[in-house]
Amino acid sequence: MIKLVLIRHGQSLWNLENRFTGWTDVDLSENGLSEAREAGAILKKNGYTFDVAYTSVLKRAIRTLWIVLHEMNLAWVPVHKSWKLNERHYGALQGLNKDETAQKYGEEQVHIWRRSIDVRPPALTEDDPRYEMNDPRYKTLKKGEFPLTECLVDTEKRVLAYWHSEIAPKLKDGNKVIISSHGNTIRSLVKYLDNLSSDGVVSLNIPTSIPLVYELDENLRPIRHYYLSMDGEVPEGEIPKHITF
């Protein structure tokens, strides 16, 4: 049996401020730092270890992974970073307060932008200061590859390309893998692994910094999955609450 651990980054400063974040490189809040330490402690107490780790090129996911591995005394584990594991790009919504955006465009429209799988928010323009094509972390991207906005289908496409080329082969070789990423990135992976319908993924929420374990067969098909707490596996349908750590 193969085990894969997925973890969404701890609470970010813009999660705290209820802003659309996307590819904006926002750091963890103090609460997010605590959540990451707690996740590491949970994994350590439950006897987990890792051979290789994957994350995005955004600091909230990178720092969460660093803290988790530090808490587990696994700081030496190789870490691979890729923009393909970045959060969904929210286009011109990035940086905007979600409640204020709902007041401007209507709650129904904002809900469609956030939760539908194939509707993109308004795009950035290339002269927008939030357009980060020239950021050195994206130097390998061609101009047409850098998104100006994304729907979940767009996010899923790049995430699964990286899954099939980089992560799945490591799992099949017997490596113990952890992925520290973002809400919509993990939603994309869960949709693929569990073969969820479009309706099924709309209601799927991924909590911050709670380890989600997938037990997979030799073909990487899910046997079962569950969240972890200090007391071990959490019953299906339940999500453990964070403790102060």
UniProtKB/Swiss-Prot annotation:
Q: Which residues bind substrate?
A: 8-15, 21-22, 60, 87-90, 98, 114-115, 183-184
Q: Which UniProt keywords apply?
A: Gluconeogenesis, Glycolysis, Isomerase
Write out the pathway annotation from the protein's UniProt entry. Answer: Carbohydrate degradation; glycolysis; pyruvate from D-glyceraldehyde 3-phosphate: step 3/5
Q: Can you cite a GO biological process for this protein?
A: glycolytic process
Where's the active site on this chain? Answer: 9, 87
Q: Where is this site: Transition state stabilizer?
A: 182
Care to name a GO molecular-function term for this sequence? phosphoglycerate mutase activity
InterPro entries recorded for this chain? His_Pase_superF_clade-1 (IPR013078), His_PPase_superfam (IPR029033), PG/BPGM_mutase_AS (IPR001345), Phosphogly_mut1 (IPR005952)
Recorded catalytic activity of this chain's protein: (2R)-2-phosphoglycerate = (2R)-3-phosphoglycerate
Q: What class of enzyme is it?
A: isomerase
Q: Which PROSITE patterns match?
A: PG_MUTASE
Which SUPFAM superfamilies has this protein been placed in? Phosphoglycerate mutase-like
E.C. number? 5.4.2.11
- Pfam families named among the record's database cross-references: His_Phos_1 (PF00300)
Return the similarity comment.
Belongs to the phosphoglycerate mutase family. BPG-dependent PGAM subfamily.
The job of this chain, per UniProt, is described as: Catalyzes the interconversion of 2-phosphoglycerate and 3-phosphoglycerate.
Q: Which PANTHER family does the entry mention?
A: PHOSPHOGLYCERATE MUTASE
Matching NCBIfam families: pgm_1 (TIGR01258), PRK14115.1 (NF010713)
Protein's UniProt name: 2,3-bisphosphoglycerate-dependent phosphoglycerate mutase
What is the name of the gene encoding this protein? gpmA
